Amino acid sequence: MLIIFISFFDRLLLILLIASKMTNTLASITYEDDITIITLDDGKVNAFSYEMLTQVHRLLDQVPQKSGALIIKGRNGIFSGGFDLKTLASGDLSKITKMIESGYNLILKLYSFDRPIIAAVSGHAIALGLFVACCSDYRIAIDGKYICHANEVRNNMAITDQIMEILKERVNKKYFYSAIYHADPFSVKDAIDVGYIDEVISEDRFMERVNEKAKELASLPHPFYANTKKIAQKERRKKISVSIKKYQIQTSILRAILKLKFW
């Protein structure tokens, strides 16, 4: 009787463990020949919480660095809604700064990635979600009533140096005021002129075109792609790295001050 009970308990524990892992999977990785696909899917708006960012960082470490190409895609209707608003509104300085720092590091990692990246913009791309797409070599959006929106200014936030360096390179000067300073949203089709998106493809051909472009860019030889990119991005990478370091120092000082007790 005891053996049966233990066996039942073990099976129940295993089921709960599997269910827990399934629930906590916010990003996944698959491989198709020389193409790696990272899929963002939190079941909601693909908010970049600290947990999702941590998972994406780990998955990026599993992507081949000397061959192939990487596709980053979202779930149906949403690429990503940006940083997790619940964390930002929590008032927990430690959680907020950890999440933001991880987001900045993700931007630098993607921007300087040694292999080509294709962003499969499967829906709305907002704030950090849009900036992640902007770090990619090529951005293909699904056709539909979706927007690309750097909405920081309209949400009482300033776009920081770490992000601005990417936007300076990507956004068409003609649209810089409206897209960045005025925080105007753009349809995915209009986002082509802005510089956010390269192509808009109908839903029935979306992933076919994404895979086609990924295979094309996967043929770029190593290390010549990576070395050329490194030379071109040298100053911008340095500026982003310095800005991240400055953020780390500032937030560590702030946390230390808040821990002090004044009597």
What do the predicted segments below correspond to?
Residues L59-Q62, S102-F113:
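Catalytic-core regions built around general acid/base machinery
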Residues F5-K73:
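Conserved CoA-thioester-binding segment of acyl-CoA-metabolizing enzymes
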Residues I126-A179, R209:
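CoA-thioester-processing core
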Residues A141-I142, V194-S243:
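C-terminal long alpha-helix characteristic of the crotonase
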Residues A183-D190:
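Acidic, divalent-metal-coordinating active-site segment for phosphoryl/phosphodiester hydrolysis
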Residues K73, A120-V121:
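Structural motif
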Residues I231, E235-W263:
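Intrinsically disordered, low-complexity segments enriched in small/flexible residues
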Residues T54, K66, G74-N105:
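Glycine- (often His-adjacent) and acidic-residue-rich active-site loop
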